[in-house]
Amino acid sequence: MLTMKDIIRDGHPTLRAKAEEVPLPLSTEDRQLIDDMLEFLKMSQDEEQSRKYQLRSGVGIAAPQLNHKKRMLVIHFYDEKKGDYVTHQLINPKIISHSVEKSYLPTGEGCLSVDEAVPGIVHRYARITVKAYTPDGEEVKLRLKDFSAIVAQHEIDHLNGVMFYDHIDKADPMKVQKDAIAVE
């Protein structure tokens, strides 16, 4: 079981390294890792488990955050509009197309690897198409928008050694780009 102790923090060199492609089919070790990542997110969102194991709630996690330079990520959150969970375990994800239109979270973004709040607006593509593989080796193309697109871009950034705060305008952190859409 993964805990907060397994998550490396801002300043660790792995967070700034480009992660490597993962060979398919997945090794037993890689399969265990991506399944543990999903379990962590589920437990972090469960009030009782989160309190018991002192987990910070997360909606996404990438293998580099666990000090594995591998192109794997997991997204898991409850989508109120759909009335269901959005869950993706992705191997070697690539953004193959995106909208011109940008979106952002008005409250800013956070990260399991960054302990302190970093105020500022992070602009992301409003819609993206991601090509990736499932843990079973099946190729998938996901069309994501709104919160799903923001979370996916945040996690894919981790695979490329980019932190969310790298996108914040240093001169005017709360500046919203013209025509950018707020995602509530």
From Swiss-Prot:
It is an enzyme of class 3 (hydrolase). The keyword Hydrolase applies. The keyword Iron applies. SUPFAM superfamilies: Peptide deformylase (SSF56420). It comes from the Bacteria. Fe cation binds at C111, H154, H158. Keywords: Hydrolase, Iron, Metal-binding, Protein biosynthesis. One of its GO terms (molecular function) is peptide deformylase activity. Its EC number is 3.5.1.88. GO terms for biological process: co-translational protein modification; translation. Binds 1 Fe(2+) ion. It catalyses: N-terminal N-formyl-L-methionyl-[peptide] + H2O = N-terminal L-methionyl-[peptide] + formate. The active site is at E155. Its cofactor is Fe(2+). Removes the formyl group from the N-terminal Met of newly synthesized proteins. Requires at least a dipeptide for an efficient rate of reaction. N-terminal L-methionine is a prerequisite for activity but the enzyme has broad specificity at other positions. Belongs to the polypeptide deformylase family. HAMAP family: Pep_deformylase. This is Peptide deformylase. It comes from Macrococcus caseolyticus (strain JCSC5402).
